[in-house]
Amino acid sequence: MLIHFDAMETTLIPHMRGGEKEVSAQMYSDSLGKIMRGRLIPGASIGLHTHETSSEVIYILSGAGKVLCDGMYEPLAAGSCHYCPKGHEHSLINDSQEDLCFFAVVPEQ
C-alpha cells in the first residue's frame, strides 16, 4: 500500500494528548495502527501518554527537540529515532526555535 502524505489533507490537532499548542499532521490509520507525518511549531508538544496497546517509533525529519520517556529526557535532532515500547510513556516536545517535523508509526499489538 502506498501512502502519499503530500496528497493528504493536513489536520490541526490542538493540545494533542494534553500537550501545548497544536500538531499539524497528515495521518493514515486503520485497525492495525497509525502512520503520521507531523509538525510541531516552537513551544508545541504532544502530551505525556502511555502506550497501553501499541508501541511507537518517531523519526525526526528536521528540526530539534526532546522526548520525555519514562521520566528521562532524551535530545532529538534530524536523523534521530525514538522508540516507545508497549506499556511505556512518552511526550514529544519542541523546545527549539524552529519547526520539528517527524514521521511516526504506531502499530497496535
Predicted region positions:
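Structural motif
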Residues: 64-66, 73, 89, 99
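Ligand-binding loop in jelly-roll beta-barrel domains
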Residues: 86-109
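Glycine- and acidic-residue-biased ligand/ion/polar-headgroup-sensing regions
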Residues: 53-65
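Short acidic-glycine-tyrosine-enriched beta hairpin
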Residues: 72-86
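A short, N-terminal "cap"/entry segment at the start of jelly-roll beta-barrel domains
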Residues: 1-34, 47
